[in-house]
Amino acid sequence: MLLCCDASADYLATATPIQEARYVTLGGIEQWITIRGADRANPVLLLIHGGPGDAQSALRSTYAVYEKDFTIVQWDQRGAGRTYLKNPNSPPEPERVELDGIELAKYLCSYLTKKKILILGHSWGSYLAIGMVQRSPELFAAYVGTGQVGSWRANVQTQFDFMLAKSRAANDRKKVELMEAIGTPDPTDAEQYFSWWSMRNPYMPRADKKWFDDLKLMIQTNPEFTEEYLKAWGDGMGYSGRTTLSAMLGEELPTNARTIKVPFFVIQGKEDMATPTSVAVQYFKVVKAPRKKLILIEHAGHFALVTHRDEFLAALVKYVKPLAIKSERDD
């Protein structure tokens, strides 16, 4: 035990922590980032949030567990959080956001003295992160997806079948009649999609329900959630959703992104229905990458990154972190 304490003390004595939060210029506008970690020598993990517009930078305590092993970079994209607060008329068009992200990755490599960084995309962010990796694979030691998107068409059909089965089992005649009248869902019809998917709350995984309850409490107690910021956060998600809707309705990564030139990992909640795990697995199977691995987390839903942090971190440390360390040693 004393040896363990001595080792920990030695680590703390030699570590160089980093805690920064500021605007940087990306794509010609000021965008908000935070950089937090226990030691600048650790691999850099750039988080690409979903939503669209669901900035995570204010949720510092939620992601603190990752900071011992990684330097965590949160980025409020165009249309999100503090970036939206400063630039309310800069639409988060996917191509533009991907180019912003590549610019940020280059900045992080330079500023933090890394040859490559790790990238983690959640939900809609997995779509953007895949785009970034395809455009500039040389910047990334590995890709990690969670709440991984795949085929939007398959996504909609899987969700529809799930909702209809649950509604029938619950004898919810209103939902059953609505969905039976639709018959086969049209993946290009956003209004139709939201008419039935908006009624999903009773059937959400328990872990996701708890996350939303925890988030409400955090918003009430977190000093970063000022009235101004909270309004920008909500308005940004609405703005981002409207701007990116056409791209979301056309997501077909199994067709458009089959070849990934960096190690490819999917760490997915087994009960995810927002980006159905079965659809994510279908995409994973067709991807060709130098190395790939699928990790399913039991009892987790769409937000495994924050609801099952210990399991998620263990997977990152075991499978992903070594690749980032190796990339720094390679010539």
Question: Which role fits each region the language model picked out?
Answer:
Residues P52-A64:
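The serine-hydrolase catalytic nucleophile loop
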Residues E67-L85:
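Conserved alpha/beta-hydrolase
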Residues E98-K116:
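Conserved acidic catalytic loop of the alpha/beta-hydrolase fold
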Residues E138-D186:
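A catalytic-pocket lid/entrance helix-loop region that shapes and gates access to the active site
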Residues R173-T255, V262:
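Alpha/beta-hydrolase
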Residues I260, V266-Q268, D272:
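Short beta-strand/loop motif that positions the catalytic acidic residue
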Residues M273-V279:
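Conserved alpha/beta-hydrolase "acid-adjacent" motif
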Residues A300-L313:
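Catalytic histidine-centered segment of alpha/beta-hydrolase-like enzymes
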